[in-house]
Design a protein with these regions (language model features):
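Bacterial N-terminal signal peptides that target proteins for export
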Residues: 2-12
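Conserved, well-structured interaction surfaces
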Residues: 105, 109-116, 126
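Residues immediately within or flanking Cys/His clusters that coordinate Zn2+
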Residues: 36-39, 43-44, 96, 100, ...
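Bacterial N-terminal signal peptides
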Residues: 11-21
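Primarily the internal scaffold of c-type cytochrome electron-transfer domains
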Residues: 53-90, 120-462, 468-474, 480-486, ...
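N-terminal module-boundary/linker segments of secreted carbohydrate-active enzymes
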Residues: 27-57
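Extracellular Ig-like/FN3 beta-sandwich strand-entry sites
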Residues: 489-491
């Protein structure tokens, strides 16, 4: 009897021991499993060594300070981006989760890649406002940060495989060795210090960090068109500056980085800790076209939880504005002549950039403001004046959201305005500013870069509308004739200005019906700053 009772007792002991061993094995496995949060660092870790940098002339070129005032650093804080995602989620509630995840790819890249590694989609709204409620939000708030860009692998860059931010990062899941790519060959000492101080991040020289294809990964944005029930209905080429650059003369002579990250002329160190002088360092200012956003970040820095200091943001606004005024466009007056009943002249608008002008986000527009005054200083003709609310006098789209201003090869009336812009159309052919509703361009007459052949351009970057058939609208520039009738009392003073606005009136005011916090907040910002929403890129004057 005693022996028969001992068998089940032993069996129970064996089962318990095996169960404990299995549990212990799972605990060890979970503890040793790589944590996706370790694949990146927030920018403050990098700033510790890459600050306190100056040129021999005393210019502060500290990488961290320049970066944190840039649009890249504040990509997730951008109030217009937040408002736009909310608008799309209201328009397409069944696709809201997918839209948030898709948009976070480039606006919250570190957080997106962490979530992706954990098998989750990034929920943008779960992280608004960005107030560092817990450690996990630090990556969401960090925008396009150092460790994301410098860990992007070369594989697939410049191909559809990596567009929309679908890049691979170096060393993902490797706790002891994650490569951080840079343009310079690291010395042994700094390499060892960085690896130990960052717990596994290793600097590695790689030429692709200066390749335009790296920028093209996020600056090629093809959105998913959404229909009823959030159903995917196709794709739409929302932003294509990389392809525009490829189709221009600039792809042979200038990279994205050479313009948007201006090179330091002198040899300078890139780290404050005994760094050797490096020739060819690029400033991390990421100059672009959105002075309006940088101004809003400064004015509302507390509400938006902006890390950059007021003077840094103001410097960024000034730098962006100066860049636009000096390096983006040129205007000329040609063929001035008197006619039997007035006068005529040609305005030539030249694009000095390596992509369309304006480019990227379709809220951007440029236009010609023309004034003609007689000898007494009276205005006898004006087209394209800017209203105090940010709208353009005579622009059909600003007056009526269902209409838009066509392209003109010749302007004869003050209510005709030459506006260089993209106009989006939905599946019904109606004008829209809804990114997930857009299926095609109804108009795209943004000024082409030099060397851009509109006849051979791919459909995604094609010229659309009347400009397509105008021989004067060509690579590098366009020419528009103005014919003014009834003018008397010359000589006449003619002034031609090319204006630019990062967020057009219609794109801002189409948010009015959306009563959620983010759209209403941005609209209040825009209305308060409406007189500062546009600047003059170039101008020309003439008398005859």
């Amino acid at each position: 009897m005693e022996m028969r009772r001992s068998v089940p007792v032993m069996a129970i002991v064996v089962v318990v021991v095996l169960a404990l061993a299995a549990l212990r094995s799972r605990e060890v496995s979970a503890a040793s499993r790589p944590n996706p949060h370790d694949d990146f660092h927030t920018a403050d870790r990098c700033v510790a060594c890459h600050n306190g940098l100056k040129t021999p002339q005393g210019e502060n070129i500290s990488i961290g300070l320049q970066w944190r005032a840039s649009v890249m650093a504040n990509s997730s804080r951008d109030p217009y981006w937040q408002a736009s995602i909310r608008r799309e989620s209201i328009d397409h509630p069944d696709a809201s989760v997918d839209a948030q995840d898709e948009c976070s790819t480039c606006h919250m890249p570190a957080q997106h890649l962490i979530d992706k590694a954990e098998g989750k989609k990034t929920e943008v709204f779960a992280r608004f406002p960005l107030l560092k409620k817990h450690e996990r939000d630090a990556f969401a708030e960090d925008g396009v940060n150092c460790s994301v860009c410098h860990q992007i692998e070369r594989k697939g860059l410049g191909t559809p495989q990596t567009f929309n931010g679908n890049v691979e990062v170096a060393g993902a899941g490797n706790q002891n060795h994650r490569e951080e790519y840079g343009p310079f060959l690291p010395d042994t000492g700094h390499k060892a210090v960085m690896q130990s101080s960052t717990k596994g991040f290793v600097p590695q020289q790689a030429i692709h960090i200066r390749d335009s294809a790296l920028c093209g990964s996020c600056h090629t944005l093809i959105t998913t068109v959404r229909g009823p029930g959030g159903k995917a209905m196709g794709q739409f080429p929302e932003q294509m500056p990389y392809q525009e650059w490829q189709h221009s003369d600039y792809n042979k002579k200038q990279s994205c980085q050479s313009c948007h990250m201006p090179q330091v002329a002198e040899a300078v160190p890139i780290t404050a800790l005994y760094g050797p002088n490096r020739v060819g360092m690029h400033r991390h200012v990421f100059i672009g076209g959105n002075f309006l956003l940088q101004g809003m970040l400064n004015e509302h820095r507390e509400e938006l939880d902006v890390a950059a200091q007021p003077e840094e943001l103001q410097e960024a606004v000034n730098r962006t504005s100066e860049f636009l005024r000096t390096q983006s466009a040129k205007v000329e007056l040609l063929d001035l002549r008197k006619t039997a009943d007035g006068l005529s002249f040609v305005v030539k608008a030249q694009n000095l950039t390596g992509h369309k002008l304006p480019t990227a986000y379709p809220s951007r527009r440029a236009w010609l403001h023309i004034t003609v005054k007689d000898s007494a200083g009276r205005t006898v003709f004006e087209s394209g004046a800017l209203n105090p609310d940010g709208s353009i006098v005579g622009n059909d789209n600003d007056a009526d959201p269902l209409k838009f201003e066509p392209y003109y090869s010749e302007i004869t009336s003050p209510d005709q305005v030459e506006i260089f812009e993209p106009i989006l159309g939905d599946s019904q052919g109606h004008v829209t500013t809804g990114l997930l509703s857009a299926v095609r361009y109804l108009k795209d007459d943004r000024i082409l870069p030099a060397g851009f052949d509109k006849a051979s351009a791919e459909p995604d970057i094609a010229v659309v509308g009347g400009a397509h058939d105008d021989p004067q609208f060509a690579g590098g520039s366009t020419q528009i004739r103005y014919v003014i009738r009834g003018g008397q009392g010359g000589p006449y003073q003619i002034k031609a200005e090319l204006w630019y606005q990062p967020i057009g009136f219609r794109w801002a005011h189409n948010l009015e019906p959306y009563k959620a916090a983010e759209p209403q907040r941005f609209l209040s910002y825009y209305e308060a700053d409406s007189r500062k929403t546009a600047i003059v890129l170039a101008e020309a004057q003439g008398t005859f």
